[in-house]
Amino acid sequence: MATTAASSASEPEVEPQAGPEAEGEEDEAKPAGVQRKVLSGAVAAEAAEAKGPGWDLQREGASGSDGDEEDAMASSAESSAGEDEWEYDEEEEKNQLEIERLEEQLSINGYDYNCHVELIRLLRLEGELSRVRAARQKMSELFPLTEELWLEWLHDEISMAMDGLDREHVYELFERAVKDYICPNIWLEYGQYSVGGIGQKGGLEKVRSVFERALSSVGLHMTKGLAIWEAYREFESAIVEAARLEKVHSLFRRQLAIPLYEMEATFAEYEEWSEEPMPESVLQSYQKALGQLEKYKPYEEALLQAEAPRLAEYQAYIDFEMKIGDPARIQLIFERALVENCLVPDLWIRYSQYLDRQLKVKDLVLSVHSRAVRNCPWTVALWSRYLLAMERHGLDHQTISATFENALSAGFIQATDYVEIWQVYLDYLRRRVDFRQDSSKELEELRSMFTRALEYLQQEVEERFSESGDPSCLIMQSWARVEARLCNNMQKARELWDSIMTRGNAKYANMWLEYYNLERAHGDTQHCRKALHRAVQCTSDYPEHVCEVLLTMERTEGTLEDWDLAIQKTETRLARVNEQRMKAAEKEAALVQQEEEKAEQRKKVRAEKKALKKKKKTRGADKRREDEDEENEWGEEEEEQPSKRRRTENSLASGEASAMKEETELSGKCLTIDVGPPSKQKEKAASLKRDMPKVAHDSSKDSVTVFVSNLPYSIEEPEVKLRPLFEVCGEVVQIRPIFSNRGDFRGYCYVEFGEEKSAQQALELDRKIVEGRPMFVSPCVDKSKNPDFKVFRYSTTLEKHKLFISGLPFSCTKEELEDICKAHGTVKDLRLVTNRAGKPKGLAYVEYENESQASQAVMKMDGMTIRENVIKVAISNPPQRKVPEKPEVRTAPGAPMLPRQMYGARGKGRTQLSLLPRALQRQGAAPQAENGPAPGPAVAPSVATEAPKMSNADFAKLLLRK
């Protein structure tokens, strides 16, 4: 970098040529097949030269057979070259087809960012210089380009620049590049390229102008600004003139007064270069900059340690700079943050708000607003602020109108966004009108725009979102106020309010009162009375309030006849309203009673099932006890030799069985032994459970253990089935499946790993399909100690880059839906929502790469028909779950207060009944002791301990009586 600047500055009359770097890029721009051909030709030439002059003599003295071999070798080389050419032609044809596909897709959706990038890459690979230039130009008009895209474009143009006109074209590209984002590397390239044109007219002034602008833009950059300072300083040092030495001194002093990394090295270099002693002012500025550097270092180190996009670190850095209040540094840190967070609308809003309120520099403010809407075109707040800023700084009407039209085509994600942008533009048009004139061009334009706004919301917006976004008719209300207050045209205002009421707003009291207040201020008493009478008849939400307003007006302005009529109408209306409310209350009470009856029925059914289950369980336990008693009586010898017993159970011969039968008959007791094998599945499960030792749960290993649930109950050997799945995450120490008393697998288990990172990696297997069911994998947490612990992988807030799709056919697969969604952008993730059994629910979540692709997909896919199912597509914004209020814990009189842990993880149940008779709950009054010790807790009577035990049926009867 420094060498290039120095050499170029010392030889101003020589035009710098593209070096090896540019040549290498030209090679990269060539098709891969051409490069292979050139490489093959070079290798052949080197081989011919390596043969030496004796090669021709050997050819002359060679035999006929040698000539045949040479012909064979030549034909082989020709065939190899032909194969390479065929491979290149095939690859070129494939690239051309892909280029055509991308161009067709961009003709449908020009805002597909990834398609633009891929098209430029393929055109550059094919060497289509004119087409790649046009593709880059089109993309730069729609999107701000990243530093990498600009540098690639600039390097290509620099390598092709041949004369002064081409150099001016490259200068224009540099000027466009530095406006998109703050890029120190682009400024450095700009400065170095301008050094190459120093021999032209005004070349020296051009170089200095570029470097000075670079210092103003990125010279304060603590980590990357040093390169700009060094390049500028070395350029000035290369010009050996006495007058230029002071320029180098000035650059050193300016650099040392700014907190930058490696300041000590720059100071040492200045001391070595300068022949004069260091001035005191320079030392003071240097020490002050060092002190500032120490304050900034924690924030810079936080940025270096964090990973992109580092939004939180940048926000903290911005807050710190805002407290200090240096405008240049505040602007720099905002620009640095936006390089990595260009798709964060809130960051653009905060930056533009600071410029609007603090700096108020026209060019800077409008430039930032323009970049903001190019980066986040779907954010209506940025467009609104842009229009206000343009009006604030006095831009012409045509420019503001064109910007508004661009906003309408930006593709907002909500219908209300269009209402907001229309309101901002209509407010601007209203401020242009001189209402002292009866008629003007501006007033006619305002009225025509009000009409167009209503048509646009009714047609364009309602067709796209199934709603106009303006249910309260705010735009029509604004129009009515303009006509009534500023144009004295109450007739038009009344027509507008009639239209507002016919759009479903006549039942709201606030709408009638708004109209009444307008008539009160700019109309007459007759129309006020008429409006209130209509309001009394139509209002359904707050009729009492409207009736009160009518009576108040008649009390102050009406006659006796008006008062009587108002009383009659209000009483009739309120009586009807009360009757309707009573009917609604009765209907609601009937529904509540019906729900209670259903709940009681469900309780009764559950109680019966529970009693039946307990009865079966009791019978099973009695049967097992009988079997155990029988085994104890006849199996004493087998208990002494358990290994022998297991062998005889599986390999008992018929002769041994008959001998045992004879032995039992002689002893006078009959014992029937069933030697037939039981069900294989139950035998295997029972033996697996019997052979597996019981392991107590060790809570100290929760960090290396995961809990796996929702597994199919039909798995015969869970450990064998699950071990290969989890071994990809790391060493599996143990898998502990849980079985029932009968040896059946209960569908969940614990998996213990050797390392904690393996357990964390295993959580990524959550929702993996195992034999048709989604397997749930969650951390191993003791719910008794953490009752509120819940694991939910997905966000429950608004995600503008993710779509929620409903109404899908159950037969729709993930691959089919992904193919549909890919047509509108890059799909990062797609998830079909299923139930616990793995069956689809007709819902899906689709995550796109950015918000613009998601908004385009909503507009294109909403209302689409898939297999006769009309799907609905919206931005993912799950509704907030209501947190149930914790009921007040009531205890029986005299009952001891129990801690929450005694009730379990969920606390007390909803129904808390004290099943202790009231007679036993009453306790004698504690003796009052004024100066004695506090009485001890009352001891419960011993009668309570002798109360008969109640069965489940008794409890159910008590609940049903309630």
UniProtKB/Swiss-Prot annotation:
A motif (Nuclear localization signal) lies at residues 602-609. GO terms for molecular function: histone binding; protein-macromolecule adaptor activity; RNA binding; U4 snRNA binding; U6 snRNA binding; U6atac snRNA binding; ubiquitin-specific protease binding. The gene is Sart3. Its main location: nucleus. This is Spliceosome associated factor 3, U4/U6 recycling protein. Keywords: Acetylation, Coiled coil, Cytoplasm, Methylation, mRNA processing, mRNA splicing, Nucleus, Phosphoprotein, Repeat, RNA-binding. Residues 559-618 form a coiled coil. Residues 601-670 are annotated as: Required for nuclear localization. Component of the 7SK snRNP complex at least composed of P-TEFb (composed of CDK9 and CCNT1/cyclin-T1), HEXIM1, HEXIM2, BCDIN3, SART3 proteins and 7SK and U6 snRNAs. Interacts with AGO1 and AGO2. Interacts with PRPF3 and USP4; the interaction with PRPF3 is direct and recruits USP4 to its substrate PRPF3. Interacts with USP15; the interaction is direct. It comes from the Eukaryota. It is found in: Nucleus, Nucleoplasm; Nucleus, Cajal body; Nucleus speckle; Cytoplasm. HAT repeats lie at residues 127-159, 165-196, 202-238, 243-276, 325-357, 360-392, 395-431, 441-474, 488-521. U6 snRNP-binding protein that functions as a recycling factor of the splicing machinery. Promotes the initial reassembly of U4 and U6 snRNPs following their ejection from the spliceosome during its maturation. Also binds U6atac snRNPs and may function as a recycling factor for U4atac/U6atac spliceosomal snRNP, an initial step in the assembly of U12-type spliceosomal complex. The U12-type spliceosomal complex plays a role in the splicing of introns with non-canonical splice sites. May also function as a substrate-targeting factor for deubiquitinases like USP4 and USP15. Residues 704-782, 801-878 form the RRM domain. Residues 81-92, 627-640 have a biased composition (Acidic residues).
